């Protein structure tokens, strides 16, 4: 299964948009790609580098 990764540098406290994310096969696994639409609009609590996997603890209010 694919996970959500950053398709660009995402600064701290930025609200996520679809253009900032892509689905990719990675290890360890992060937020599942099928939840990408669910996290749109949520803010990251730290800077996320290009191609870095989004983990649940990086996204504010992610359940």
UniProtKB/Swiss-Prot annotation:
Intracellular or extracellular location(s): Secreted
Tissue note: Detected in blood serum (at protein level).
A Pfam family of this chain: SAF
Gene3D superfamilies: Antifreeze-like/N-acetylneuraminic acid synthase C-terminal domain
Ranges for domain AFP-like: 3-62
GO cellular component: extracellular region
Cited CDD domains: Antifreeze_III (cd11617)
PROSITE patterns for this protein: AFP_LIKE
InterPro entries: AFP_Neu5c_C, AFP_Neu5c_C_sf, Antifreeze_III, SAF
Keywords: Antifreeze protein, Secreted
Superkingdom, taxonomy of origin: Eukaryota
UniProt-annotated site: Important for ice-binding, residues: 8, 13, 17, 43
Family per similarity comment: Belongs to the type-III AFP family.
Role noted for this protein: Contributes to protect fish blood from freezing at subzero sea water temperatures. Lowers the blood freezing point. Binds to nascent ice crystals and prevents further growth.
Listed name of the protein: Ice-structuring protein AB1
Organism of provenance: Pachycara brachycephalum
């Amino acid at each position: 299964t694919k996970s959500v990764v950053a398709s660009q540098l995402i600064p701290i406290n930025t609200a996520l948009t679809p253009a900032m994310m892509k689905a990719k096969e990675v290890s360890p696994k992060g937020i599942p790609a099928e939840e990408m639409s669910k996290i749109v609009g949520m803010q990251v609590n730290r800077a996320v580098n290009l191609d870095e996997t989004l983990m649940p603890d990086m996204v504010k209010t992610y359940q």
